[in-house]
A protein has these predicted regions:
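Intrinsically disordered, low-complexity polar regions and short flexible loop motifs
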Residues: 1-328
Length: 328
């Protein structure tokens, strides 16, 4: 029925021919919308909406948030009411958060602290309230879309808040020095190809869930055997994770690292060090030429990461020393 937004449907990436028909009708007798070809890339989340009145019905395609802000909620507003004018969105009686939003556009996501919000819709540039949005509760680390839908002409205009898909950010590092270039597969599909030693991918944003990961020599068929895997890894919504191939090829080991979201330092920078050299001893990380007790990170062993530490901004020369060793 009108006003319904489905749950996300998980489908393989690719091109899909979409048709919308009256309930119970045969597509061969004619579609309300379509057939239309839509491309959905792997690892993305998309909303497809039917808008406008029946005579002028059209399909709108929205790219949903790739990743929510970790310490706030993330919200966008979507104007899908074809006969409604351009509008401003504001807290009850307050200054507008969003201005001059017109059909069929959507805003960028804006970050808001979690909590309860009373919002109102006003004609663009006016303080007059056209519609009071029922109280919305936002949770930190979650992305939301607020859809303005329906028609002013038949009084079907309403607002539909919705939670966007939970998304995880994952990046992959090849840190096994004697392993060949590799391809990385997730749930049977290649996500990275011909990855050399020392490479760290950008974050890949994927729907939260469990993924079966396999790493094979570049160009090889996973059916012929994997360098790593198959192994099932869980990625929760709103998280960032680094998955690294470490150790020598004969004992290659995947390591998962939780990439915590941290607020940037007011002054300076924040740095984390991860020890992923399997045959290296425990180490200290220190400014070049500094004393033993001036090490920034101490006694770091293989597979261990030290939390983000504030350091001065600018170029810094660092030494890696055996744990407890003096500068040479």
């Amino acid at each position: 029925p009108f006003g319904v937004l489905s749950e996300y449907l998980e489908v393989p990436g690719g091109t899909y021919t979409i048709e919308v028909v009256a309930a119970g009708a045969d597509p061969a007798d004619g579609a309300v919308i379509g057939p239309v070809d839509l491309d959905f890339a792997s690892g993305t989340t998309t909303t497809v909406a039917a808008t406008n009145n029946l005579e002028n019905i059209e399909a709108q395609v929205l790219d949903d948030a790739p990743m929510p802000a970790g310490d706030t909620a993330q919200v966008r507003v979507v104007h899908f009411s074809a006969d409604a004018p351009a509008v401003d969105i504001a807290p009850d009686g307050g200054d507008a958060l969003i201005t001059d939003l017109s059909y069929p556009n959507d805003t960028d996501y804006i970050n808001l602290p979690g909590g309860k919000y009373d919002l109102e819709i006003r004609p663009a540039g006016s303080m007059d309230v056209a519609f009071d949005i029922p109280e919305i509760t936002l949770t930190d680390g979650v992305s939301y879309s607020v859809f303005a839908i329906g028609s002013l002409a038949d009084d079907s205009f309403t607002v539909l808040p919705a939670v966007d898909a939970a998304v995880a950010g994952v990046r992959v590092g090849h840190f096994s020095a004697d392993a060949p270039n590799v391809d990385v597969y997730a749930n049977g599909g290649a996500i990275l190809e011909d990855v050399p030693f020392g490479a760290l991918s950008d974050y890949l944003f994927v729907p939260a869930g469990t993924y079966t990961i396999e790493v094979v020599a570049a160009g090889a068929d996973p059916a012929d055997g994997a360098v790593i895997g198959p192994v099932d890894l869980d990625f929760d919504g709103g998280t960032l994770t680094t998955v690294a191939a470490t150790n020598e090829l004969a004992e290659i080991t995947p390591v998962e690292i939780n990439d915590k979201r941290v607020k940037p330092a007011a002054e300076g920078a924040k740095v984390r060090v991860v020890h992923l050299s399997a045959n290296a001893p425990k180490v200290d990380i220190a400014p070049d030429g500094s004393k033993r007790n001036e090490a920034i990170f101490k006694n770091l062993k293989f597979g261990q990461s030290k939390g983000y530490t504030k350091v001065p901004a600018g170029e810094v020369d660092l030494d890696i020393r055996a744990a407890g060793e003096r500068a040479k």
